[in-house]
Amino acid sequence: MANAQLRRGQTTAAIRSAELALELDSLRETAWQILIRSHTTAGNPGSALRTYQRCRQVLHQQLGTAPSPDTRAALDGLPG
């Protein structure tokens, strides 16, 4: 649902949906990716970067792994 909302330009709804998905399963990288892209699309690069950092921390603590290349690629739209 969050991905469809983001495609329709409904960034606030996409952020809420992705956050809800992460409350249910914090290891779901696709939800992290959508949340990062939603913040970027909404013009909030700081929030996108903080979201990525939270994702990285959760994955490291829970699984001992780093975010996937797809999750890192979600940051590609950030300035600078």
Predicted feature residues:
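Intrinsically disordered, charged and Pro/Gly-enriched terminal/linker segments
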Residues: M1-G80
